[in-house]
């Protein structure tokens, strides 16, 4: 499925409703250039979960949001240079958590160990002043 958004607000509103019911157990991998909308798209999912303050974990690498029955992991691998480094921040344990929703920005390093049966891929592109998102999964 390919979607086009003319504004960040429209992208957030779409992603807020698209992920209902909540996709517990899914691993979302978000690829695309800097500023192409990956974090903005995830803001909608975060709003659906009731998370009002949502930022990219570029420097912490992993943000964890705890809920009663599950966790939401937001992972940003932009600054991670190897699979070993991903493992050092608990990456393998996170990927094995079936009672969670996991979103990984800049996922290239970890793709070889992401369980394919749980994978949902999103590819973002800047087109003019808007954004195009290709969804697979």
UniProtKB/Swiss-Prot annotation:
InterPro entries: P-loop_NTPase (IPR027417), T6A_TsaE (IPR003442). ATP binds at residues 8, 35-40. Mg(2+) binds at residues 39, 105. One of its GO terms (biological process) is tRNA threonylcarbamoyladenosine modification. This is tRNA threonylcarbamoyladenosine biosynthesis protein TsaE. Signal peptide: none annotated. Required for the formation of a threonylcarbamoyl group on adenosine at position 37 (t(6)A37) in tRNAs that read codons beginning with adenine. Is involved in the transfer of the threonylcarbamoyl moiety of threonylcarbamoyl-AMP (TC-AMP) to the N6 group of A37, together with TsaD and TsaB. TsaE seems to play an indirect role in the t(6)A biosynthesis pathway, possibly in regulating the core enzymatic function of TsaD. One of its GO terms (cellular component) is cytoplasm. Keywords: ATP-binding, Cytoplasm, Magnesium, Metal-binding, Nucleotide-binding, tRNA processing. It comes from the Bacteria. Gene3D superfamilies: P-loop containing nucleotide triphosphate hydrolases (3.40.50.300). Belongs to the TsaE family. It is found in: Cytoplasm. GO terms for molecular function: ATP binding; metal ion binding.
